[in-house]
Amino acid sequence: MTDEQSMVEEFHKKFDILVQASPTAASEETKRLRIRLIQEEFDELKESMAEGNLAALAKEMADLLYVVYGTAVSYGIDMDPVFREVHRSNLSKVGGYKREDGKWVKPPTYSPADIEPLLAMQMSASEEAQRPLGGVEEMLRGA
């Protein structure tokens, strides 16, 4: 987990905001809250861009990242490996070309981000951490 996501998780814990230990579907209430928070911060980001104040822009970018990381915390998703996989996928776009509208067209060598295995690993690691100790670990813990 990145330092940034860890800080947001700390905030969630201090303010009794939902924290999931592993990837978990969110309730409708949580979904609505996260969408509203992201939209609010995105709107504030657009306003700061229109104003041209770099300090305000930097603050609003941080606020948007904060609520996006908060969404990851609420869903129990460690974003570090997810971001790395998306980065790997994005770099596989080398060899494509940019259209007139600025969109990058993917080359045949493009490889889409494969997120499912990452979430499965996160769920498995969480389940492993929750298993009761046995054998040597249990004896050492009792010592």
Question: Can you describe what each PLM-predicted range is?
Answer:
Residues 1-61, 65-143:
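Flexible "arm" and connector segments at domain edges
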